[in-house]
From Swiss-Prot:
Activated by phosphorylation at Ser-189. It comes from Rattus norvegicus. There is a cross-link at M1 (Peptide (Met-Gly) (interchain with G-Cter in ubiquitin)). Gene3D superfamilies: Phosphorylase Kinase, domain 1 (3.30.200.20), Transferase(Phosphotransferase) domain 1 (1.10.510.10). A motif (FRIEDE motif) lies at residues 332-337. This is Mitogen-activated protein kinase 6. Heterodimer with ERK4/MAPK4. Interacts with (via FRIEDE motif) MAPKAPK5. Interacts with UBE3A; this interaction may be indirect and mediated by HERC2, possibly via HERC2 interaction with NEURL4. Its main location: cytoplasm. In contrast to classical MAPKs, the TXY motif within the activation loop is replaced by the SEG motif, whose phosphorylation activates the MAP kinases. Keywords: ATP-binding, Cell cycle, Cytoplasm, Kinase, Nucleotide-binding, Nucleus, Phosphoprotein, Serine/threonine-protein kinase, Transferase, Ubl conjugation. Residues 647-657 have a biased composition (Basic and acidic residues).
């Protein structure tokens, strides 16, 4: 037993001395870890909640929770026995001493189970649900009379003893004081209630709410006890509001206009008749229970029953006894809120000078910097003398904060009678991890800092967004793999684009050099015609002989044109022969003799060379295409030039020399391509593939980069 106790002390950091033994983990509260232990002084099992004090925010939450639970004393609220420091030391009444500690322990009443575990077994009988609902309302009446908002009511925070069927409200880690005599609009924290139990007003105005938010959560819990499942289980705020609008009527026109300005795509002209009323969601319940629930789950908080009014409803008359439903005799007021601010002001500088642990793994950048007080503490009262801009740190629940900032659509309203409740999600990429908010809550961008989620929708394309579809479970690993694959593809395509551009530049330079060389060697026919026209326009003079001599010299130049043309044709024929050799045409050793003897072959080769130059000119004007596409298109043209049948033996020999496609459709390696030394690829059949730059001239091929083709798709397309 001693070894087990020491191991728990080391693993979880519980340091309470030898008084408390047999520690067992129970779960996580609003802002701490909860264990059960046996108190050796009274031999009784208790629940111990450890709150780690690491920064001013945690100190503020601990101060607030301790202040509230010390004053609350009710049969339906979990009792607190004592508050201890490290090693089980007793704390003084001065709560300011917490700033000198690194942790605090709250020893409270141990309960057998919670309502969430009970509902996992199935729905409750209506009589049991009514009994638990009465106790919940009885506790809420006392809490609200003390000017306290719980702000985190859910089945996991309602504890039950199954022997006597007693229900008690616990976990006040997110509770706060709110004096109803002062306005708190704009100075309340956002999104503290678990999403499934948030009221419509809390979804529309996260910074402006009242005690009615606890009543909405109580109504959702009552419906869950009757059905065994969550009443409104939305994946995000938009879907949560959508589910509410399907079942809860919007009676007031001002509420409909507010919804119309925020989410017009889901708003109809008549919202008083929901598509799925509560009678469909809760089949089989009594009429009195349905009427009771409909008066609690109202869209407008002004129409919602308070805890005291709900206890007076006829459905609760079987248990209701006003004289046994006490209220707080010492409620909190605005002074208690201001005292928290002043206390934090006095100890603010001291908190930041806490010594770091020697084995702490946090860097200087990991410690939050707070230059102002918390916005949650400021009220519209002259006694609140602080200008606060920081926001309250929101505690995380495993079922909260399951979505990012992409939550609302600001689309043009589509008013018609056909109301579609299906949301339109355009992005299929998503990842799934049900504990995403515990792992990446600081980067998920879910905890919005705007006055209203639904009023200020911004599609943030520059930031990583983890949710594109309404999912309750997200997979962070899939998202990381998808983002890695996308970055690899982008890098690869960029590299290939750079290589193709270089090849295109080399091809254009080679074509320009060839054109300049042809212009330098040819006969200037335009100059000859211009001189002849100018000479014929002039009158004959005495110096006729000299002009005739000039004319004769021009004629002699014209006669030399045929000789020059022959040399040019010969050069073109040689170039065409080289191109045909590179393109894999049938190479014949007696090329010269065939050109001299066969006039038809000479004409075809000249025509082919002209078509090649024409194709190059067209390609310069059009958009760039892959060099493999050019290669295969020219190969098809060269195959059309074959007019004479070739013997089967010679054809096989020439195919091996040229390195083109064999009859089986496989790529063979030619001697010319081996000399180029291009990188190799592997086809699905296992035969090696090489990048081919046959369209470049020999001079350009020496300087052009050897770049592999990015896929086999273009090659296989030409094969087919």
């Amino acid at each position: 037993m001693a070894e087990k106790f020491e191991s728990l002390m080391n693993i979880h950091g519980f340091d309470l001395g030898s008084r408390y033994m047999d520690l067992k983990p129970l779960g996580c509260g609003g802002n701490g870890l909860v264990f059960s232990a046996v108190d050796n002084d009274c031999d009784k099992r208790v629940a111990i909640k450890k709150i780690v004090l690491t920064d001013p925010q945690s100190v503020k939450h601990a101060l607030r929770e301790i202040k509230i639970i010390r004053r609350l004393d009710h049969d339906n609220i979990v009792k607190v026995f004592e508050i201890l420091g490290p090693s089980g030391s007793q704390l003084t009444d001065d709560v300011g001493s917490l700033t000198e500690l690194n942790s605090v322990y709250i020893v409270q009443e141990y309960m057998e189970t919670d309502l969430a575990n009970v509902l996992e077994q199935g729905p409750l009988l209506e009589e049991h649900a009514r009994l638990f609902m009465y106790q919940l309302l009885r506790g809420l009446k006392y809490i609200h009379s003390a000017n306290v908002l719980h702000r985190d009511l859910k089945p996991a925070n309602l504890f039950i003893n199954t022997e006597d069927l007693v229900l008690k409200i616990g976990d006040f880690g997110l509770a706060r004081i709110m004096d109803p005599h002062y306005s708190h609009k704009g100075h309340l924290s956002e999104g503290l209630v678990t999403k499934w139990y948030r009221s419509p007003r809390l979804l529309l105005s996260p910074n402006n709410y009242t005690k009615a938010i606890d009543m909405w959560a109580a109504g959702c819990i009552f419906a869950e006890m009757l059905t065994g499942k969550t009443l409104f289980a939305g994946a995000h705020e938009l879907e949560q509001m959508q589910l509410i609008l399907e079942s809860i009527p919007v009676v007031h026109e001002e509420d409909r206009q507010e919804l119309l300005s925020v989410i017009p795509v889901y708003i109809r002209n008549d919202m008083t008749e929901p598509h799925k009323p509560l009678t469909q969601l809760l089949p089989g319940i009594s009429r009195e229970a349905l009427d009771f629930l409909e008066q609690i789950l109202t869209f407008s908080p002004m129409d919602r029953l308070t805890a005291e009014e709900a206890l007076s409803h006829p459905y609760m008359s079987i248990y209701s006894f006003p004289t046994d439903e006490p209220i707080s005799s010492h409620p909190f007021h605005i002074e208690d809120e201001v005292d928290d601010i002043l206390l934090m002001d006095e100890t603010h500088s001291h908190i930041y000078n806490w010594e770091r642990y020697h084995d702490c793994q946090f860097s200087e950048h990991d410690w939050p910097i707070h230059n102002n007080f918390d916005i949650d503490e400021v009220q519209l009262d002259p006694r609140a003398l602080s200008d606060v801009t920081d926001e309250e740190e929101v505690q995380v629940d495993p079922r909260k904060y399951l979505d990012g900032d992409r939550e609302k659509y600001l689309e043009d309203p589509a008013f018609d009678t056909s109301y579609s409740a299906e949301p339109c999600w355009q992005y299929p990429d998503h990842h799934e991890n049900k504990y995403c908010d515990l792992e990446c809550s600081h980067t998920c961008n879910y905890k919005t800092r705007s006055p209203s989620y639904l009023d200020n929708l911004v599609w943030r394309e520059s930031e990583v967004n983890h949710y594109y579809e309404p999912k309750l479970i997200i997979d962070l690993s899939n998202w990381k793999e998808q983002s890695k694959d996308k970055s690899d593809k982008r890098g690869k395509s960029k590299c290939e684009r750079n290589g193709l551009v270089k090849a295109q530049i080399a091809l254009e330079e080679a074509s320009q050099q060839l054109a300049e060389r042809e212009r330098g060697q040819g006969f200037d026919f335009d100059a000859f015609i211009a001189g002849t026209v100018q000479l014929s326009a002039q009158r004959e003079s005495a110096d006729v002989v000299d002009k005739l001599n000039d004319l004769n010299s021009s004629v002699s130049q014209l006669e030399m044109k045929s000789l020059i043309s022959k040399s040019v044709s010969r050069e073109k024929q040689e170039k065409g022969r080289a191109n045909l050799a590179q393109l894999g045409a049938l190479y014949q050793p007696s090329w010269e003799s065939q050109f001299v003897s066969g006039g038809e072959e000479c004409f075809l080769i000249s025509q082919f060379c002209c078509e090649v130059r024409k194709d190059e000119h067209v390609e310069k004007e059009n958009t760039y295409t892959s060099y493999l596409d050019k290669f295969f298109s020219r190969k098809e043209d060269s195959e059309m030039l074959e007019t004479e049948p070739v013997e089967e033996g010679k054809r096989g020999e020439r195919g091996r020399e040229a390195g083109l496609l064999s009859s089986g459709g496989e790529f063979l390696l030619s001697r010319q391509l081996e000399s180029i030394g291009t990188p190799q690829f592997h086809s699905p059949g296992g035969s090696p593939l090489k990048s081919i730059q046959a369209t470049l001239t020999p001079s350009a091929m020496k300087s052009s980069p050897q770049i592999p083709h990015k896929t086999y798709s273009n090659i296989l397309k030409h094969l087919n």
